[in-house]
């Protein structure tokens, strides 16, 4: 499984990348707003830090404007992945862009039907939103499972990018189902390493080691 970090915070991205935990980055208009920076400027900086795909989203809803904005975004760096909403215009733009060799991340996916159409349009990634579905009382993981089955049935190459991930359990469940990628906020990715028994065991080992009076280096 690949880990993408869902943020436009360059400091956080750099820290996680230095740990070897980042395979890519996802951003959206809300995260750009939170960063307080120009979208082109911050996206270019992120692309220079991370070797993997960096998703940057168009802010248009109609095909022609989507294509214009996508052209600007695509020029930022070679590892750019253009992010489009799963709409009819978005699907049309996806088909056109992937035909030109661009990577495309279809976002705001809330149904298996949407994921099927995205794969037909040649999307590189499909981003089903787990947490937002959970908020409506629907189990978001069931959607991941449905998409996995459909993609496996027809050998689609579109990768399932589990998004709107809020907890470490979301990550575990997505991995068990077979999502190709999880994108999560920095805090969630860092929390994956945490376990109270690890902390307790380390404390015991260090205390016992101190009693030996030895040094390794």
Swiss-Prot record:
Subcellular location: Cytoplasm
Active-site residues per Swiss-Prot or TrEMBL entry: 83
Gene3D superfamilies in the record: Aldolase class I
Domain of life: Bacteria
SUPFAM superfamilies, alphabetized: Aldolase
Reaction catalyzed: D-sedoheptulose 7-phosphate + D-glyceraldehyde 3-phosphate = D-erythrose 4-phosphate + beta-D-fructose 6-phosphate
UniProt EC number: 2.2.1.2
CDD domains, sorted: Transaldolase_FSA
Pfam family, one: TAL_FSA
Keywords: Cytoplasm, Pentose shunt, Schiff base, Transferase
Enzyme class: transferase
Pathways involved: Carbohydrate degradation; pentose phosphate pathway; D-glyceraldehyde 3-phosphate and beta-D-fructose 6-phosphate from D-ribose 5-phosphate and D-xylulose 5-phosphate (non-oxidative stage): step 2/3
Predominant subcellular localization, coarse grouping: cytoplasm
GO molecular function, one term: aldehyde-lyase activity
Family stated for the protein in its record: Belongs to the transaldolase family. Type 3B subfamily.
Name of the molecule in the record: Probable transaldolase
Organism from which the protein derives: Brucella canis (strain ATCC 23365 / NCTC 10854 / RM-666)
